[in-house]
Amino acid sequence: EVFVTCEPTDGEIGRLIRRILHKEIPATPQTVAHLYAADRTEHLYQGPDSVTARLEAGDLVITDRYLFSSLAYQSVECGFDFVYRLNEPFPLPRQLFYLDIDPDLSDKRLSGRGVRDMYERLSFQKQVQAFYERTLEHFAGSGVEIHRLDGSVPAEELTRRILASLRL
C-alpha cells in the first residue's frame, strides 16, 4: 500500500505551525524549528498511521516535506548547525526528490494564489534555495538517493518522473 503524508502534519502541533506560518500567532524562529521537530517526532512515531508503523507494515511512504525542508527553511533564521542538531536523530529516507525551481519563477506562481505564508517572500526563498543546496551537499554520500528534478516543468511531468524513479 502507498501512504501519502505531509509536514507540517494535520496533528495539533502541525496545526499550530500552520497558524504561525499564516501569522495568526507570533513565535520566534527557534520555537518554530522546535515545533517542526516535535511535529516530526509525532509524525514518525505516534500511532498506527505513523510513518514508522506504516513502514513496518510494508507500506511505501511518500511525504511532502521532511527534515531536509527544515534544514533549508529554519536554517535561514536559526543557522544550519542548530537545525541540524534538532533533526539529526530522525531516520533518513531511501529517496529524496528535490524540486529545483528558480525562486523568481516560484514567486510568480505564488502571486496567483492570494494569501502567502511568512516564508513565501522572494528574498527569503532565495536564502532557502541556498540552504537546500547546502543540505543536498551535506547528505551526498549518506545513502539517500537524491533526485534533483526541474521544478519548472508541468506537474504531470514531475509526477511521471517521480513515479518512474519509485519503480512501482
Predicted regions mapped to residue ranges:
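Hydrophobic anchor at the start of a short beta-strand
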Residues: E1-V2, V61, R94, I146
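Short beta->alpha linker loops
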Residues: P8, E12, D39, Y66, ...
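A glycine- and Lys/Arg-enriched "phosphate-lid" helix/loop adjacent to the NTP-binding pocket
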Residues: R65, S69-F131
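NTP-dependent small-molecule kinase module
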Residues: D104-L168
